[in-house]
């Protein structure tokens, strides 16, 4: 904890003197909170789009449009060319490493049609027939080197477009074999694989015309033995479907709904995976009324509960078709299609933290946020690499929330959400995450002293975030500020309106955390 000072004392007084709403105080008992599960040590994981690696047209940031202008829904102006990402930047590596260890998922819609050029030559001006992009050895080595530097294990999907298929339209492994072999030859390791990105919307993902569940089943029958031969230790995750089970409905092909995919393959996966976007951003949702959301809804129970609703749908499919298999959420963000303008602001930290905490309670082992550093929903600004509010939320989670999940044992309500996990170091120590999404301060009672880490902002759509009243900023080289808790004593504890607070209890002595 930080050493005492007049400034800290003044801030502590300010936090404890916050006017509290008339809701009944909620009592915590950190010593007796029972264990209800555990998550992977790489629970917080992150996506880098394959298109970032190769270069190409990705979701255009809102700041790139003239002031006051909005992207025309479903137009070519939704995209902006990016050159291949420079993954050697020291600032990027330092900021990413602070979140490790994690899975780095290199995939996305564009990965479905990316050709791996297994020579040291430069990429050709035009991709080979049946592909839309080219991945060079140099580019892929950059990914492998980056993953090693930031303590990440690689997760990928492979190309499945027309260029990978035989004359009967069945997938062939030559391209994937070259990528796996080259990865191994340079000392890399692929830890997990999804066959393709989002097979239930294959009509948007460069699958062959007329692709259906039966075709998917035939492909998996070829891919699974190939994977066992080339990377016997790699986890086979799937199916990796998206946009089912929630309020937002898009044009899923009836012949490709997840249940039909699972029926076609049988129980083949090591890990059941799915993707989750509770709505579409302004880029895509504007053309389809009812598919988007608003910043005004960002703190509502309806919005914050959507991830659990969608998870329940996929968990039900897992239980029927892959019983007992771990479940991973391998791609998610505020909204699909690059995120909304406010996905890069403080208001989205409530969704980020609540989704992680709530799904940890539901048994999700890994959640891969999309993306690390591309477009509006990224943790880092893609031009400056400045950390956005969700980065700081992720950093606090990494430092304070361990893998053992506890029940907080206290009902809250009224916009207050409580979660608890053992601290990363164990030793009986407990962290409680208190998310106050309401417009008024709330009160907790605790029998133990501890330290608080309270995230707030001047405005909900602020691009900055404060920790215990101090603005968080990274140095030019990616160095991080001191992340220190503020001591509090046993008794009453005030939670500011629209704030998220991590409360650590080093003296909890919780047997589940030993």
Where are these regions (language model features)?
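Bacterial N-terminal signal peptides that target proteins for export
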Residues: 1-10
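Bacterial N-terminal signal peptides
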Residues: 9-19
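Non-catalytic accessory regions flanking glycosidase/transglycosidase catalytic cores in CAZymes
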Residues: 15, 22-255, 259-271, 312-315, ...
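Anion-binding catalytic surfaces of enzymes that hydrolyze or transfer phosphate/sulfate esters
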Residues: 266-278, 282
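Glycoside hydrolase catalytic-domain groove-lining segments
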Residues: 279-337
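Ligand-binding pocket segment of bilobal, Venus flytrap-like solute-binding proteins
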Residues: 345
